[in-house]
Amino acid sequence: MTLEAVPSPLPPATAVAVTELARLAAQSDGVNPLSEQTLLHVDSEHHGDLHVLAYDGEPGTLDVSGLQTAENLIGYAALGPDGSAELVVTPAARRQGTGTALLRMLLDHGKDRLRLWAHGRLPGADELAAHFDLTVARELYFLRRPSAPLPEPGWPEGIDVRAFVPGQDDDAWLEVNARAFATHPEQGAWTTEDLGDRLHQPWFDPEGFFLAVDSKTGALAGFHWTKVEGDEGEVYVVGVDPSYQGTGLGKALTLHGLHHLQEVRGLPAVTLYVDGTNTAARALYEKLGFTTAALDVQYAPATV
């Protein structure tokens, strides 16, 4: 086995190989091993990202353009500038030390700041984390709700709802998103580039990106961004500006988006992710019929 640590961007052929590796692992495990953010960064240049590639033997051969084909790629790990990390090993190469080697290299590059995500919390993830004395530092719940009757949203007085307009609402949305998620290490740090990445994805639909606007001031008060891929919809992100929190706007926005996914898009189920510390949001979602389908955990060194 050969390990190779490279900064962004990955060669296109290698990025394709990483995406295919993640697909094979997801097919085997029933859960995606890499987050949307990581997969978006695989084939784009984000300064500070480190990619660790594990090959069966030497790195892949070169194609006609001089880029590695990565045909023998058996493992991959990503380390972001904030210390957030993920790794995946192809199913056929597990229990052979590949995951251990990948994690050891991640620790060599950022032990003091490492935060390793394990999606679905599979048994192998707990074993690997324990081997390096990593403990659970954070939990992220994956919830699902089958199609069922919903209450109507009760809007606070003076709130209008409209669709997001790309190129017009970008800056205002980024500002409110940052304020709404000031204590959230990933969502609150979104940049113009992060937003642009999503706006150019095949799944993006502005008609499913709802903005709540103050009818008197025109200020953006909150939003509900929905996402549809396949036959499931997702409460992608709901945010409320702190000055409008406590008014019931968050619940109204949530219901508005759920009605859209269920009745306008006709989807049989809706999913969402919620941080384990956000007990208020979890309680709201449970009252609306969501139940836990999976659990993601983040491991960190015990001293962090």
Swiss-Prot record:
InterPro entries in the record: Acyl_CoA_acyltransferase, GNAT_dom, MshD_Acetyltransferase, Mycothiol_AcTrfase
Pfam families: Acetyltransf_1
Record GO terms (molecular function): mycothiol synthase activity; protein-N-terminal-alanine acetyltransferase activity
GO biological process: mycothiol biosynthetic process
Enzyme Commission number(s) of this protein: 2.3.1.189
Domain N-acetyltransferase residues, every copy: 8-162, 159-304
Binding-site residues for acetyl-CoA 2, renumbered to this chain: 238-240, 245-251
Swiss-Prot/TrEMBL catalytic activity: 1D-myo-inositol 2-(L-cysteinylamino)-2-deoxy-alpha-D-glucopyranoside + acetyl-CoA = mycothiol + CoA + H(+)
Binding site for acetyl-CoA 1: 87-89, 95-100
Residues that coordinate or bind 1D-myo-inositol 2-(L-cysteinylamino)-2-deoxy-alpha-D-glucopyranoside: 36, 186, 227, 234, 273
Alphabetical keyword list: Acyltransferase, Repeat, Transferase
Family classification: Belongs to the acetyltransferase family. MshD subfamily.
Functional note: Catalyzes the transfer of acetyl from acetyl-CoA to desacetylmycothiol (Cys-GlcN-Ins) to form mycothiol.
Assembly and oligomerization: Monomer.
Protein name: Mycothiol acetyltransferase
Native source species: Kribbella flavida (strain DSM 17836 / JCM 10339 / NBRC 14399)
